[in-house]
Amino acid sequence: MTDHSPAAASDNAPLRGHALLDSLTATVAADGTDLLGTREEAVPWLRRAGLLPDDAAISNSEHGALLRLRDALRDVLAARASGAADPDATARLTRALADGRLVVTVSPAGAAALASSARASYSNVVAAIAIAVAQAW
């Protein structure tokens, strides 16, 4: 099991909850500027957010998955804000969050927590985002 808490790559604490979701959805601007537009741009952003360790990177396919996750999250949030349901967006977000491979762990004292069962860096990024979604909603 992997602790869902990503290691901060800098002195900044990892983003959590609403702050993480707000920051992730704000990575693309109305004018088309995209802070995650390329893998080379996404990796430093993930590190600054405390989601990706300094010694880790993401593959091209993981970068594409990250963009799909971000876009699905933006679509779900837009639907929630308008009070309308968007089954397609929620299905896309659910599929994207599955990459986090979350499991529930229980401590000897009986406290439950979420953790990623994956060892891959990208899965831990997704796990942190999935936990933020669960905590925020």
Indicate where each model-derived feature is located.
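Short helix-coil boundary/hinge micro-motifs
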Residues: 1-137
